[in-house]
Amino acid sequence: MAAACTRTLGKVGRLVLDTPTCRFTNTAAFVPRTSMRCQGRAYGTGSSGFKSRLLLAAPVRGSGRVLGCAFLLGGGFGLYQTIKLTLQHHLAEKESDASDLDTDLKLTLYQYKTCPFCSKVRAFLDYHRLPYEIVEVNPVMRQEIKWSTYRKVPILMVNGTVQLNDSSVIISALKTYISSKDKKISEILACYPEMKSKNDRGKDVIEFGNKYWVMVHDADADQLYPGKDSRKEEIKWRTWADDWLVHLISPNVYRTPTEALASFDYIVREGKFGSFEGFFAKYFGAAAMWIISKRLKYKHNLQADVRQDLYKAVNDWVAAIGKNKQFMGGDEPNLADLAVFGVLRVMEGLQSFDDMMEHTKVKKWYSRMQKATQHVS
């Protein structure tokens, strides 16, 4: 959760530095997404131990300034080791395997590995066996994309010259290219115009027109969408994945102090912290994420137990597929299948993922999607 941790820990530190005292109470909380463009996450499950729970459950009193410094110090240690671990994983990453498609595209994906939007793009590329290189972006400095005026991930570079932004635009544009075969990527990109505006807080925002549409001729559309409402349903559920499902990930991953600690415990363990560094990174880092994230539950009007929102969303998706189809797309996954799978996949290895598999009907569909998107080695 490097990107979210960076901004969240900074906010917590400044907040606590300006606050006379700070008190923790043992209530559930949720982690905020970072502009909903990239939410990474820390991995790992399992009990954090009785002492761990006591440290978060017990009230903390004292100088707000000292505690704020502790948050920043712990966050800094944790962030450094997280970035180092991410870079180690990146060095071990290989280019994806050969394509089943006759295409001369050279694709480079700039990403955070645990971002659900980046995961969506990888699911699409893997399913279509499109070879691509990965550049893991440093979530703090983002030096890897300093050349880009667009500062969010994923970014996909095509043949080193054409830049595609926004996960849904990337997927729609590439699907158009694969399906039409008579247009250049640069020509297709013009179908998804960038629109700049300001939100109600006066912040600049960027959206993209037509981003859920695959731009093909009628004859190609009939082949691509054989069902009466298949195109409409694909767009509906792709939009749902971006506008609702992705909002449920962070609240469930960091639902309780124990789950937050379990996630940070993984980072500390894999990052080979010293005992002092590990203490601050694990306990203060997890506490910071836990406290700040409380607002997310109210912002998105979630239930007291956010697992129930996740279960309902996933079961709604399975019900929409129906009993007589393997995928939303029928016998093969469509873009909605790939989007939903990409979002849910970032919870793998966490308690929230295990609970979802146990308490919903998604397991069979998810298993089929795993097989469909596997790399060919």
UniProtKB/Swiss-Prot annotation:
Residues in GST N-terminal domain copies: 105-182
E.C. number(s) listed in UniProt: 5.3.99.3
Binding locations of glutathione: 153, 166-167
Keyword Lipid metabolism: yes
Membrane topology value: Single-pass membrane protein
A Pfam cross-reference name: GST_C
Lumenal membrane side: 1-65
CDD domains: GST_C_mPGES2, GST_N_mPGES2
GO molecular function terms attached to this record: 12-hydroxyheptadecatrienoic acid synthase activity; glutathione binding; heme binding; lyase activity; prostaglandin-E synthase activity
Protein's cellular compartments: Golgi apparatus membrane
Ranges annotated as spanning the membrane: 66-83
Pathway as given in its UniProt record: Lipid metabolism; prostaglandin biosynthesis
Protein name as catalogued: Prostaglandin E synthase 2
